Amino acid sequence: MYTYMEYLQKCFYKTTNWNEDNIFSNITATSSALLEFPIPNGCKVDLSSKATEHSASSFTLSNYHSINGSLAYLYSSIPLRNTMGTKDISLQDAISGFKMLELNSSTTNALQNPVYKNTHDSLLYGRMYFPGSALEAMIIKRISPQTQLLIKCINNPHLDKNGTMIVYLQKNAPKLSREFIYSTNEALFGFRCLYNMGSSESNLNRSINNSNLIPKFDNSVISIGTEIWYAALSMSPGLSTAFRYSTRSTSTGKPLTMTFACNPILGHISSAYTVKTSVASTFCSKYDFNVFSYASNLSLGFEIYNYSSSNTSNSAATPPRIKNSDSQVLSNNSTDSKGTVHIRSPDVLDYKNHSNVIISPIQTFDNYYHINPTLLPSTKNEFEEVRPPPLESQVDSNNETAMTAFENLVNESDFSSVIKLSTSLNDKMLKLLWKGRCKDFLVTTGVKMILNPITNTPEFNRFGISFSYAC
C-alpha cells in the first residue's frame, strides 16, 4: 500500500512524463509487490490533506509499543491535478501490484499529457518524527526532460555522524537509462544502467499480419541491467545484474513478466514468474538459490480483487443487450399463424445500412425453396457494401485491440477490496493482507505467521490494522 506522500510522488512522475519502470531498482518491483508486501504492526492512523494543487500535508499516529507519529509536508512546483482522495481513488492506484510495462511509456505519457512543457520542475518533501528528533527529506529536481537529480537525507542521532545523504543523478531514456549514485555512508559510489530491447510498432503490426489465427505473444520488452558499487572507506565492491522479460498475449491481452537476478560475489540467483491470470487475479512464483551454500527457497504469492457491490448489482440487473441491427431484423420480419418467418423486401429493410447483416436470397415457402430476386445484388457496388470485410482484417483488428481492451478493463474496473497472500517454504512463513474501503477510509489489516523451529507450532509474528484518509 502506498502512503499518500508516495502517491503524490507517483502523480508528480506521471505529470512530468517520468517512467519509473525504466529504472534498474524497479526491475523486480512486480514480484516484490506480490511477495514482499509489508504487514501493519499495531494500530496506525494516517490523515492527509491536499491544501492546494502545489502543497499537501500528512499526519501519522501509531501505538506500537509506545505512542509515536510523524508530520510530513510536500510541495510541487507543478500543479498536481490528477490526484484523488481516499474516497475516489481506485485500488489499482493505491496498492502496489502488477504493472503492465510498455517500451515507450514516456512517449505515451507525453501524448496523454501534452500540457506539460518539460520545464525545470521540482518536488520538495520533508517528514519529522516524534518523540525524538529524527528527520527525513527528499528533493527532486528536473534538469531536462530525461534527466533529474534526486537527493535523500536522513537525520537521526542514532546513526553514524547523525545522518546520511544519498544523491542520484538519473538519465531516463526509453532505450537506455543510467544512474550515478553517491552516499555519504562509507563514501559509497554506485552506477546503474538498464537497456531495453523490444519490437517496434511496425514489427508488431507485421508479426500480427503473419499470424492470423495462431495465438502468440508479442509486444515484448526485454530489459537487461546491472549495478556496480564501491565503498571507498571499507574498500568493499558490489556487483549484481538482472534480466526482465515482459510480454502480452495478442489473443487474450493478458500480460506476464519474468525476471532473473544474479549476484556473482555472493553467489545468489533469483528467478521470478508473474502472470495476470484474469482481470481480478495475479499469481507470482519466485525461486532463490545460492551456488556457494546450495541453499534454496521457493516463494508463492497471489492477489485477488473483489468487485464492488454496486458494480456487481448493476451488471446482474442489466439484461443482455441486442444489437440495433439484430433488433431491427426481428422487428421487420413477420411471422404467420403457422410459425413461418417471412423476410420482407429490401425496400422495407434497408440492408445497405446494415453491413453486419447478411440476408440470404434463398427462402422457403410451403416446404419449397425459392430465390427472391429482389434480395440479389443488382450491381457490384451494392454487393461490396453488403459483403463483410475479409477474415484477415477482422483478425488483425481483434489482435490489435485485445491488449488495449484488457488493459482498459483492468484500469476501469471498480474494486472494493483486495486480498494478498504469500508464503515461503524455507522461511516457513505465511502472510495475509486485506485492503478495502470503509466509508471514506482505506483500511488495511494483515497477519504474519511463522512456524516455531523448536516446537513446530504456528505463531503470530505480526498483526495490525491501518486507517488512511486523504482529501
Curated annotation (Swiss-Prot):
Entry protein name: Mitochondrial distribution and morphology protein 10
Keyword presence, Transmembrane: yes
The entry's keywords: Membrane, Mitochondrion, Mitochondrion outer membrane, Transmembrane, Transmembrane beta strand
GO cellular component: ERMES complex; SAM complex
GO biological process terms, semicolon-separated: establishment of mitochondrion localization; mitochondrial genome maintenance; mitochondrial outer membrane translocase complex assembly; mitochondrion-endoplasmic reticulum membrane tethering; phospholipid transport; protein insertion into mitochondrial outer membrane
Organism annotation: Debaryomyces hansenii (strain ATCC 36239 / CBS 767 / BCRC 21394 / JCM 1990 / NBRC 0083 / IGC 2968)
Free-text comment on this protein's domains from its UniProt entry: Lacks alpha-helical transmembrane segments, suggesting that it resides in the membrane via beta-sheet conformations similar to those predicted for other outer membrane proteins and porin.
Signal peptide (residue range): none
Chain positions covered by the region annotation Disordered: 313-338
HAMAP family: Mdm10
Location(s), subcellular: Mitochondrion outer membrane
Protein's membrane topology: Multi-pass membrane protein
Function text: Component of the ERMES/MDM complex, which serves as a molecular tether to connect the endoplasmic reticulum and mitochondria. Components of this complex are involved in the control of mitochondrial shape and protein biogenesis and may function in phospholipid exchange. MDM10 is involved in the late assembly steps of the general translocase of the mitochondrial outer membrane (TOM complex). Functions in the TOM40-specific route of the assembly of outer membrane beta-barrel proteins, including the association of TOM40 with the receptor TOM22 and small TOM proteins.
